[in-house]
Amino acid sequence: MTNKNRATLIGFSAILLWSSLVGTIRIVCENLGAYGGVAVIYSAASVILLLIFGLKTIRHIPKRYLFWGGLLFASYELCFSLSIGFANNGRQAVEVSMLNYLWPTLTILFAIAFNNQKANFLIIPGAILPVIGISWVLGGDQGLNPMMMLANIQDNPLSYALAFIGSLIWASYCMVTVKLADGKNGVALFLIFTAIIMWVQYAFSSEPALSINSFSLILYSFLAAFAIGVGYAAWNYGVFYGNVTILAGASYFIPIISAFLSSILLNLTLTYSFWQGTGLVCFGAMLCWLATRNKKSHLKEIKQ
């Protein structure tokens, strides 16, 4: 196996790790609360990334990237994790996460709008299909049903709003990274910043004192932190040394992989209409990717 293929496989591992996050974060938050659970997870993830990357290159990171990148990164992670933590149940957590997975499509649309990215006609169905897919998912057992979709959103508007806002923020983060990062990686520092914010939120919340009193809870907390910390490290390695085109294409299947792993972790039976909607989200994102594939790409930051 060549070094490039090995690096690509390492990048693939990040996709699997990130896909497990919805299930593991939900389990931890069910036991520790939304604020306390995510604070524990991101603190542990920060330690893992510090062990991998350290902070020795911080002085070389552009200050504008540190500020805007850190602000957007922390905001996204807050929206993503809390949208799962605030969900009423496991099924809703999985449905909410599908809104978050609009970010690949939004990233490409933002690149077209703000980065002069060129695209062909496939961008039109590529932009429309994920919206239809999300509507299909939120329609529940009845599939594409606007009234049921609105009823589901009204049942817990905060979670759905956080997930959608998070997808917008991550697409913006990708644009900021391309313009300001100068090839530097500030993720370890950003995770520390995120963890601090989450502990502050927990301190001002009404959640009870943390009680981690079972091995399974420790295990799921570690798995979530491992998925975040090692996931970022593996992805960066894959992007730098592997086949970026293959990794970018594979990343668009995260919604399907995430839903599958979440259904196992949370013991859920997801309906046929849910899988149809999720498939449309992935297919639309793939069309957006294909619409720009033969053009000079301005996209260098792809995520979970």
Language model features by range: what are they?
Residues 17-24, 56-94, 99-100, 136, ...:
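Specific transmembrane alpha-helical segments of multi-pass solute transporters/efflux pumps
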Residues 36-47, 85-116, 244-263:
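Specific alpha-helical transmembrane segments that line the substrate/conduction pathway
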Residues 54-64, 112-122, 175-186, 239-240:
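Membrane-interface helix-boundary motifs at transmembrane edges
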Residues 28, 37, 83, 113-115, ...:
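Hydrophobic/aromatic residues within transmembrane alpha-helices
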Residues 1-39, 145-179, 200, 261, ...:
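Glycine-/small-residue-enriched transmembrane alpha-helix faces in small-molecule transporters
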Residues 49, 68-73, 119-142, 252, ...:
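Hydrophobic transmembrane alpha-helices of multi-pass small-molecule transport proteins
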Residues 16, 20-27, 31, 45-61, ...:
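Membrane-interface helix-cap regions at the ends of transmembrane helices
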Residues 6-10, 35-51, 67-68, 125-132, ...:
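Hydrophobic alpha-helical transmembrane segments of multi-pass integral membrane proteins
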